UniProtKB/Swiss-Prot annotation:
This is Large ribosomal subunit protein bL19m. The keyword Ribonucleoprotein applies. Residues 34-43 have a biased composition (Basic and acidic residues). Keywords: Mitochondrion, Ribonucleoprotein, Ribosomal protein, Transit peptide. Component of the mitochondrial ribosome large subunit (39S) which comprises a 16S rRNA and about 50 distinct proteins. GO terms for molecular function: structural constituent of ribosome. Pfam families: Ribosomal_L19 (PF01245). PANTHER family: LARGE RIBOSOMAL SUBUNIT PROTEIN BL19M (PTHR15680:SF9), RIBOSOMAL PROTEIN L19 (PTHR15680). Residues 34-53 are annotated as: Disordered. InterPro entries: Ribosomal_bL19, Ribosomal_bL19_sf, Translation_prot_SH3-like_sf. The keyword Mitochondrion applies.
Length: 306
């Protein structure tokens, strides 16, 4: 074989040799891309799924049941660190004593330690005429008429000397405060010290007592005709023309449209939700424990007959 034929054979072999060897177990890149495009066409379009909302559901009545957990709306009195620490102390106190749900107009019995009493404890029964302040300084006032004398006791809700709070009658009134009972007839503020608790069905709404009290003749402790009270029946009987004119002069009918005043005198809903979300777990656990204790049947040993 001469030199020219060898050169021709080498050129033919170089042209016939494959540049890449493909085995039976592999596929080319072009084939893989084609298969992926076919799968995309055949697959149905997927809709984007929204993330599951796992936020805690806070009952809407928390701001009425636990009003002391909401801070004071005055900006100059706000301190976020102090408020958070106070809420922790309030929860710790609620773990030590059962602080039930009550409103202005409910009849309560409060047992507190008293170093001057015979048994070192004292018990007072009365109607709640006011609730004010917030945090650890939350307080309420009970009123009762004993021996024809009006008696009022101011209790701090988180006072460590309070041993027990019982709700004898759970109800609301038409007004936010009942200070006018001081000028009303004594029968509207008289309650038996041995009064038994009136049970209310579990889950039932709190009843609203729409009774209208009768005031005694003037002079009064306050000018009740200027306060737009709904729970008083006979204010007009003791008013003269000069009283009506003076009451009309101090009226401010535009305040119900003042949105800025409402904003400055209340806590925004977003902040309320954030505060109650912080304490919801502990409060819910305490509510369940209170319900379990309420359902327990206490065994009373019968007295032996003579």
């Amino acid at each position: 074989m001469n030199l020219s034929t060898r050169v021709m054979l080498n050129r033919l072999t170089q042209q016939c040799v494959y540049k890449r060897i493909v085995t039976f177990s592999t596929k080319t890149a072009e084939h893989v891309i084609e298969n992926q495009e076919e799968q995309k066409k055949e697959a149905p379009p997927t809709t984007p799924t929204s993330p599951v909302n796992r936020k805690t559901i806070i009952p809407a009545n928390y701001r009425f049941v636990y009003p002391e957990f909401l801070p004071d709306p005055k900006v100059e009195w706000r301190n976020l660190v102090r408020e958070k620490l106070e809420r922790l102390d309030m929860l710790d106190r609620r773990k030590q004593i059962d602080l039930p749900e009550f409103y202005v107009g409910s009849v309560l019995a409060v047992t507190s330690s008293d170093p001057h009493a015979a048994g070192k404890t004292s018990r007072f029964v009365g109607i709640c005429i006011n609730r004010d302040r917030c945090g650890l300084r939350a307080r309420f006032i009970l009123r009762n008429v004993i021996d024809h004398q009006g008696m009022e006791v101011v209790y701090e809700l988180y006072d460590p000397t309070i041993l027990k709070i019982e709700v004898l009658r759970l109800e609301k009134r038409l007004d936010d405060s009942l200070f006018y009972l001081r000028d009303a007839l004594p029968e509207y503020s008289t309650f038996d010290e041995n009064m038994e608790a009136e049970p209310l069905e579990e889950g039932a709404p709190v009843p609203v007592n729409d009774i209208k009290v009768v005031l005694r003749p003037r002079p009064w402790l306050e000018r009740w005709e200027r306060q737009n009270l709904r729970g008083v029946a006979n204010i007009d009987e003791y008013l003269k023309d000069k009283h009506r004119l003076s009451a009309a002069k101090v009226q401010k009918p535009w305040e119900k449209y003042d949105m800025m005043k409402d904003y400055r005198s209340s806590i925004p809903e977003e902040e309320q939700t954030e505060i109650f979300a912080e304490v919801h777990t502990e409060l819910h656990a305490l509510e369940l424990q209170r319900k379990r204790n309420k359902r327990k049947r206490t065994f009373i040993k019968p007295k032996q007959l003579a």
